[in-house]
């Protein structure tokens, strides 16, 4: 928490804070008025007034932890900290009133808005500082704003877990995601993006000229479930059911067992097996109107998808560092964890966001406070 000092420094300022251009460097003391402060320990300080001998501008210099506002920086930090921990605005005001520092809900909300805006600006400045990130993880989530669903993108450094950006997107379509991926790739200079298996991210990665690792946790369990469903469908086929030319029930069982082994091993060299299976079932006819898809057609679709996405699924095995170690995560858990900590954990206790400004600022504030540990964390936000 910020420290509140009761003693004002007698050291003259080094520049004149006048809005008009002034290059004065000499000042004289112009009184030492008392200022009432709302704080848990300090209730009043003396501010030092200075007069610029060049332009005559008179200004005040406050002790550490005190500004022009009635609240001390420590009290502002406490109100923000209580809210981030999960307390409502009303609960924050009740807690501070019990400490002898009553604040209104509007004042607490204003403290949140100020610190959230500064935290968001610091995250954006860090992202635009030409930082180098090799693997960028990104994922979308949905929250409610005044009853309307909003798309929020969480972008994270896959290696360190550091939040790069939390932003609100207008939509989750291909055009929006592609432009976003291109912008992030340009700002970070990344080589790889880590995401789920949505086609929008695949298009965005190709447009940005970067590699993509598809989260295996999004693909492997669903594919294994699909393999078992197709196996049950093949097992329950009636004897009189015709089979496509060149295919048989025994062959389907062998191919399903091979697919299960390929999915569990996830070896890059299995690409040619998938291409062979894809060619084997490429002539399987689709279902007629009103009919269910046959197991042969479902195998055709599954092998086609796997053969196309296999390089993206196994990039973590093929793409290694100079020392031979893997540095690309196989799953996008880093994004899921960041979404839970920065967005969802505090959002669960709310009835939705009331404005887009709050939606942009509060997750950024949570991410900044979670990552920037230490006593100077709040001081850097409140002093900005």
Regions found by a protein language model. Give the residues of each.
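Short cysteine-rich clusters marking metal-coordination/redox-active sites
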Residues: 16-20, 52-55
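Short, flexible, mixed-charge glycine/proline-rich loop motifs
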Residues: 2-15, 40-46
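Acidic/histidine-rich catalytic cores and adjacent linkers
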Residues: 195-198, 202, 242-384
């Amino acid at each position: 928490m910020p420290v509140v000092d009761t003693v004002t420094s007698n050291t003259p300022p080094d520049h004149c804070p006048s809005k008009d251009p002034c290059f004065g460097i000499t000042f004289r003391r112009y009184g030492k008025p008392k200022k009432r402060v709302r704080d848990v320990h300090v209730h009043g300080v003396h501010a030092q007034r200075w007069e610029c001998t060049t332009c005559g501008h008179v200004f005040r210099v406050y002790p550490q932890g005190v500004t022009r506002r009635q609240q001390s920086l420590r009290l502002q930090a406490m109100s923000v900290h209580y809210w981030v921990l999960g307390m409502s605005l009303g609960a924050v005001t009740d807690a501070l009133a019990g400490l002898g520092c009553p604040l209104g809900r509007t004042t607490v909300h204003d403290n949140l808005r100020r610190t959230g805006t500064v935290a968001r600006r610091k995250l954006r400045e860090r992202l635009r500082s030409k930082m180098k990130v090799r693997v960028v993880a990104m994922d979308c989530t949905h929250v409610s704003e005044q009853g309307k669903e909003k798309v929020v993108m969480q972008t994270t450094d896959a290696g360190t877990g550091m939040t790069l950006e939390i932003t609100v997107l207008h939509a989750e379509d291909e055009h929006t995601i592609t432009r976003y991926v291109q912008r992030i790739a340009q700002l970070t200079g990344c080589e790889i993006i880590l995401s789920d298996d949505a086609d929008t991210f695949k298009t965005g990665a190709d447009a940005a000229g970067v590699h993509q690792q598809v989260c295996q946790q999004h693909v492997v369990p669903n594919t294994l479930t699909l393999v078992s469903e197709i196996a049950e469908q093949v097992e329950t086929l009636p004897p009189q059911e015709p089979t496509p030319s060149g295919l048989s029930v025994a062959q389907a069982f062998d191919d399903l067992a091979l697919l299960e082994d390929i999915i569990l091993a996830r070896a890059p060299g299995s690409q040619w097996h998938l291409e062979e299976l894809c060619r084997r079932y490429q002539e399987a006819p689709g279902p007629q109107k009103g009919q269910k898809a046959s197991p042969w057609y479902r195998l055709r679709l599954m092998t086609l998808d796997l053969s196309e996405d296999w390089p993206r699924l196994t990039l973590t095995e093929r793409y290694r560092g100079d020392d031979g170690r893997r540095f690309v995560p196989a799953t996008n858990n880093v994004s899921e964890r960041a979404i839970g900590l920065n967005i969802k954990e505090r959002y669960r206790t709310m009835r939705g966001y009331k404005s887009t400004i709050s939606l942009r600022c509060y997750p950024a504030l949570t991410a900044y406070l979670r990552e920037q540990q230490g006593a100077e964390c709040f001081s850097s936000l409140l002093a900005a």
